[in-house]
Amino acid sequence: MNTIIPLLLLSLLITVYAYALEDGNKEEMQDIAESEFEASNEMLQLAHLLEADRAETEEDRNSRQKRCWGANVPCEDENSPCCPPLKCEKTFGYGWWYGSPFCVRSGSG
């Protein structure tokens, strides 16, 4: 009996000490997990900012004035982007020689 009581007390102290260490480890692991989550959250926010910036520059690039087609360039129809003094017209030889109309000065064909 004299040996059993100290062994039980020793096992009780070891168990309490192990639980205390486990709680400390849990807190440390939780802190590490939170810091990793914060780092990944910051990376995610940075990725969103870069994506928004890329979309903004894409809008800026697409907002420039569209280029027009010069003289004697084949065009599809009247809505083709010929330069202002030019119009998309069917010139002489259209159909049997030329396959499409051309951007020409108005009334020259």
From Swiss-Prot:
Keywords: Cleavage on pair of basic residues, Disulfide bond, Ion channel impairing toxin, Knottin, Secreted, Signal, Toxin
Chain positions listed as propeptide in the UniProt record: 19-67
Signal peptide: 1-18
GO CC, one annotated term: extracellular region
Tissue spec: Expressed by the venom gland.
TM annotation in the entry: none
Disulfide bond entries: C68-C83, C75-C88, C82-C103
GO function term, MF aspect, one: toxin activity
Entry superkingdom: Eukaryota
Subcellular location: Secreted
Chief localization: secreted
Pfam family, one: Toxin_22
Protein family membership: Belongs to the neurotoxin 14 (magi-1) family. 07 (Jztx-56) subfamily.
Functional description taken from the UniProt entry: Probable ion channel inhibitor.
UniProt note: domains: The presence of a 'disulfide through disulfide knot' structurally defines this protein as a knottin.
Name of the protein in question: U26-theraphotoxin-Cg1b
Species name: Chilobrachys guangxiensis (Chinese earth tiger tarantula)
